[in-house]
From Swiss-Prot:
It is an enzyme of class 7 (translocase). The complex is composed of two ATP-binding proteins (LolD) and two transmembrane proteins (LolC and LolE). GO terms for cellular component: plasma membrane. This is Lipoprotein-releasing system ATP-binding protein LolD. It is found in: Cell inner membrane. Part of the ABC transporter complex LolCDE involved in the translocation of mature outer membrane-directed lipoproteins, from the inner membrane to the periplasmic chaperone, LolA. Responsible for the formation of the LolA-lipoprotein complex in an ATP-dependent manner. It comes from Rickettsia prowazekii (strain Madrid E). The keyword Ribosomal protein does not apply. The gene is lolD. Its main location: membrane. Keywords: ATP-binding, Cell inner membrane, Cell membrane, Membrane, Nucleotide-binding, Translocase, Transport. The lineage of its organism: Bacteria, Pseudomonadati, Pseudomonadota, Alphaproteobacteria, Rickettsiales. It is a peripheral membrane protein.
Length: 221
């Protein structure tokens, strides 16, 4: 049996709009195992991004628990730095840094050896088909290449969990499939758990598990 890396236990998130309580998440449960690829679909406004923010310790639930077993740190910013990786629809690359420099930044923030960081970043970028683009600036890269750099950056610290919010949402269909397949290849190679929210059902069906978020709860799709 795989090791459990994340438990969301009876998660609720409520907002007040005027005199009305909006129940975005309402007693939601999820268990993610090591190396598992999980997709979450749902209509716009169903709470998919809210769910990722709570799972990534970027937001607090109204009720419920987020449990990340067997971790050394208790402070949220350290848990995010050492155990979690994030990919968004926008790549958020630093425009004045090369592809390679963008990728090694999370390693340097942790105070790790720069030579080792460059070696590992070069390997990941190579796995993502960017071996000839290491020293290109973001503005010299295509949209798909920029997103691959962002993916490499999320993987450089070998996180237990990647939280991906529409990671290919800005790409054309052909580029979407190419980038996504490379992403899954590297994630599987690292045995990294991926929790992805998406509107793209074709991509969602490439994952190990598929859930539909509806009325604040997750159901197997």
């Amino acid at each position: 049996m795989n090791n459990i890396v994340l438990i969301l236990k009876m998660i609720s998130k409520h907002y007040k709009q005027g005199n009305t309580i909006v129940r975005v998440l309402d007693g939601l449960n999820l268990t993610a195992n090591e190396g598992e690829l999980i997709a979450i679909i749902g209509s716009s406004g169903s709470g998919k991004s809210t769910l990722l923010h709570i799972a990534g310790l970027l937001d607090k639930p109204t009720n419920g628990q987020v449990i990340i077993p067997n971790i050394k740190y208790k402070k949220y910013h350290l848990i995010r730095l050492y155990y979690l990786g994030f990919i968004y629809q926008q790549h958020h690359l630093l425009k004045d840094f090369t592809a390679l420099e963008n990728v090694i930044i999370p390693r340097l923030i942790r105070g790790l050896d720069q030579k080792e960081a460059i070696k590992d970043a070069t390997k990941i970028l190579d796995d993502l088909g960017l071996e000839k683009k290491l020293y290109n600036m973001p503005g010299e890269l295509s949209g798909g290449e920029q997103q691959r750099v962002a993916i490499a950056r999320s993987l450089i610290n070998k996180p237990r969990i990647i939280l991906a919010d529409e990671p290919t949402g800005n790409l054309d269909p052909n580029t979407t499939n190419e980038v996504f397949n490379l992403f899954l290849k590297v994630a599987r190679k690292q045995n990294t758990t991926v929790i992805m929210v998406t509107h793209n059902h074709e991509l969602a069906h490439k994952m190990d598990k598929l859930y539909n978020l509806k009325h604040g709860l997750l159901n197997i799709a």
